[in-house]
Amino acid sequence: MSKKSQLVFAMVAGELSGDILGAGLMAALQKTHPNARFVGIGGPRMEALGFESLFAMEELAVMGIVEVLSRLPRLLHVRSSLIKSITELKPDCFIGIDAPDFNIGLELKLKAQGIKTVHYVSPSVWAWRPKRIFKIAKATNMVLSLLPFEKAFYDKHQVPCTFVGHTLADDIPLESDKASARQLLELDPEAEYLAILPGSRGGELKQLAEPFVKAALLIKQQFPDIRFVTPLVNQKRREQFEQALKAHAPDLEIHMVEGKSREVMAAADGILLASGTATLEAMLIKRPMVVAYRVSPLTYQIAKTMMQVNRFSLPNLLAGRDVVPELIQHDCTPEKIAEAVGVELNRDFTPIKAEFERLHQMLRCDASQKAAEAVLALVDAKDVN
């Protein structure tokens, strides 16, 4: 364990899921180094633990190849400023949390300056653009992976990697309490609820709010007594969703909640959601789900040429088979979504729940503590390449 009186960590988290991981890692590091300093880009959970943000996390929350290109000048400015600030700070370690297209380039520059670098959350090199592994090898001293099958890929390419599990699997109980979640959210304890999660980023809502709202109308026709509840990450996303609701289903009642996505999923009988980390959370909460996603046509055409897998959601990737329905791009239509939700709400969930429980146990590793131990070991290590 490092004996230095004050350790300094530079960190960059690009979105909500990274903020959750970053806060968990900070809390674990603070157990042994209570006066450690944390600087870079973080979200509200990290800032609540004393993180010093140089830029708002929202700066990095962009999706899709085409969308990133439109923001490229600003992203390059942010990265350039961070390189300067972090190089001057000379931290004991830099930890890039997810956001690989931003962080790997940043790590490459910082490592060249003699700063130890960690990438927390393996990019999906096993799924698309596998040659990124060579850049990752140059940019990082260590990768912290969340999924067990990722480490074998890094071992094959002789890139230092530690499987730490997922902090969500540690935080979420093996059996979620629907009644308590409904009480907290002041929802009817007897009604049937579908949670609708169209994503946490503006670009996601731009693509998904309309088909999700239209699908809700069709679902209401199948299940006249069903109710809808939607968590929105902030006021901007709420306004975006309200606009879609007003435009496409002005008479449909959807109960909106700011934040509390985990509680909303726990309170629900089924979940319709965007592909992403939320699918892992839904799996850990153990609810029937339908995963849907689409991006701009050009982004999709470019991405399709680089894909190495035919599954997108984390439950299916972890299981190695189709456990939950995925409706991607051209299949992401109100009609197909409504049909899939109907099937999931009516089918026997027992075998799927058993698989979710198996996967939950597999990912329960005290991730934040394991990640902190790996980072501190790197800080103490001599002769690191």
Curated annotation (Swiss-Prot):
One of its GO terms (molecular function) is lipid-A-disaccharide synthase activity. It comes from the Bacteria. Pathway: Bacterial outer membrane biogenesis; LPS lipid A biosynthesis. It catalyses: a lipid X + a UDP-2-N,3-O-bis[(3R)-3-hydroxyacyl]-alpha-D-glucosamine = a lipid A disaccharide + UDP + H(+). One of its GO terms (biological process) is lipid A biosynthetic process. It holds the Pfam family LpxB. The keyword Lipid biosynthesis applies. It is an enzyme of class 2 (transferase). GO terms for cellular component: membrane. Keywords: Glycosyltransferase, Lipid A biosynthesis, Lipid biosynthesis, Lipid metabolism, Transferase. The keyword Transferase applies. Its EC number is 2.4.1.182. Belongs to the LpxB family. Condensation of UDP-2,3-diacylglucosamine and 2,3-diacylglucosamine-1-phosphate to form lipid A disaccharide, a precursor of lipid A, a phosphorylated glycolipid that anchors the lipopolysaccharide to the outer membrane of the cell. PANTHER family: LIPID-A-DISACCHARIDE SYNTHASE, LIPID-A-DISACCHARIDE SYNTHASE, MITOCHONDRIAL-RELATED. This is Lipid-A-disaccharide synthase.
